[in-house]
């Protein structure tokens, strides 16, 4: 019997012991009866998205977890961001990830502009698209929250351009670096683009309103992750001969899923932010599993809480995710399904960024050899029967349990 599969990524799930939580991690601190139930009837382990000690970006981590070698396939974040906001790009386009940020006296004081809403970001992006002219064709489009996408048409040869993002607050933006004449041209265009966009943003009514309300203004653009068309050798759906769907709100992860052949769905209320409607996602997964062989579910807010150094909020979000998972397992046949739960990487609250810590992994459902673990958490995962594996081992293990793998050899 061929089983169906559900892969759930709780973004930035892994963490470190936190004094505020009594020496527990947010996952260990959280009340997670549904994931604990799966742990008791499943098998735990740890996974390194790239390799031990290597912090992973969300893009490279997801590529790896879906079974691709990011060192061979990855050509920058920007292209995935662009695919994720629904742009169909040409192979000679150059795409970038952009943050709306707050600049004061030449210093970046907030890299996410107070986590402005998606609606605000889209209005600001529209104004930039309409009012900025840098002498080349470009597309500037809001994504999720403080995120946006910039595409320079026909300029892929300039991909060796650097970022202006200092990646920490309290420092001035970087100048765009370059390595050759093509990337020098792109760097000059980006400098002009950022300057003109800054002028548009400073006077925009949304920022005037935010000033009056005492909120951080979104008056600057931090641009990074120059990306060209990814080198995907074979679609996920072709490699595993499955019909695959994804339930995602965040543009970057949507882009990765689109690039490898998933049909992508975003139910109403799914925002990728703290206010996301996780139950709408759960219901969509159950609905899609009737027509698809493999369903991927992405939950973003846990990562944001790690970046914001909010341990108790991260634990609360994990509890919300657990209820989402509870709805799913209550409405599917676990014997005919394989379910895997992990994070794309660790985002420890103390680091406020991605780290190279391994990520706890849980697999349960039909055909799974159980171990003696009792609940889902970092330390319990260290005892699990899966041991410590690589991120790109997860899908092959799932497909084998789903009875969809082909034998190697005679």
UniProtKB/Swiss-Prot annotation:
Reaction equation(s) it catalyzes: (2R)-2-phosphoglycerate = (2R)-3-phosphoglycerate
Keyword Isomerase: yes
Swiss-Prot/TrEMBL keywords: Glycolysis, Isomerase
CDD domains hit by this protein: iPGM_like (cd16011)
Gene Ontology molecular-function annotations: metal ion binding; phosphoglycerate mutase activity
Superkingdom of source: Archaea
Biological process according to GO: glycolytic process
Recorded metabolic or biological pathway in which this protein acts: Carbohydrate degradation; glycolysis; pyruvate from D-glyceraldehyde 3-phosphate: step 3/5
UniProt family annotation: Belongs to the BPG-independent phosphoglycerate mutase family. A-PGAM subfamily.
Role of this protein: Catalyzes the interconversion of 2-phosphoglycerate and 3-phosphoglycerate.
Protein's name in the database: 2,3-bisphosphoglycerate-independent phosphoglycerate mutase
Gene: apgM
């Amino acid at each position: 019997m061929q089983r169906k599969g559900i892969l759930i990524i709780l973004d930035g799930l892994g963490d470190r012991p936190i004094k505020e939580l009594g020496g527990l991690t947010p996952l260990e601190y959280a009340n997670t009866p549904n994931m604990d139930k799966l742990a008791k009837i499943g098998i735990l382990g740890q996974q390194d998205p790239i390799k031990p000690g290597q912090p992973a970006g969300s893009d490279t981590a997801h590529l790896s977890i879906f079974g691709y070698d990011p060192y061979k396939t990855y050509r920058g974040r920007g292209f995935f961001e662009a695919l994720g906001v629904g742009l169909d790009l040409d192979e000679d386009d150059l795409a970038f990830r952009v943050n709306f940020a707050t600049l004061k006296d030449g210093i970046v004081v907030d890299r996410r502009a107070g986590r402005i809403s998606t609606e605000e970001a889209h209005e600001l992006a529209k104004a930039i698209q309409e009012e900025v002219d840098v002498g080349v064709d470009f597309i500037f489009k809001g994504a999720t929250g403080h995120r946006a996408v910039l595409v320079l048409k026909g300029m892929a040869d300039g991909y060796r351009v650097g970022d202006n993002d200092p990646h920490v607050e309290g420092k001035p933006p970087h100048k765009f670096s370059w390595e050759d004449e093509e990337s020098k041209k792109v760097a000059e265009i980006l400098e002009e683009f950022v300057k003109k966009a800054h002028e548009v943003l400073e006077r925009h009514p949304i920022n005037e309103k935010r000033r009056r309300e005492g909120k951080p203004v979104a008056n600057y653009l931090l641009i990074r992750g120059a990306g060209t068309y990814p080198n995907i050798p074979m679609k996920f759906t072709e490699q595993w001969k499955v019909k695959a769907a994804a339930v995602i709100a965040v543009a970057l992860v949507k882009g990765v899923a689109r690039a490898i052949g998933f049909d992508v769905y975003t139910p109403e209320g799914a925002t990728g932010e703290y206010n996301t409607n996780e139950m709408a996602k759960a219901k969509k997964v159950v609905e899609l599993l009737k027509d698809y062989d493999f369903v991927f579910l992405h939950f973003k807010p846990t990562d944001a809480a790690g970046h914001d150094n909010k341990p108790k909020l991260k634990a609360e979000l994990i509890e919300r995710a657990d209820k989402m998972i509870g709805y799913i397992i209550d409405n599917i046949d676990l014997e005919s399904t394989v379910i895997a739960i992990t994070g794309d990487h660790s985002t420890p609250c103390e680091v406020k960024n991605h780290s190279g810590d391994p990520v706890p992994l849980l697999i349960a459902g039909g055909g799974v050899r159980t171990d003696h673990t009792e609940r889902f958490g970092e330390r319990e995962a260290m005892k699990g029967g899966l041991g410590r594996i690589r991120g790109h081992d997860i899908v092959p293990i799932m497909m084998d349990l789903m009875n969809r793998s082909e034998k190697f050899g005679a």
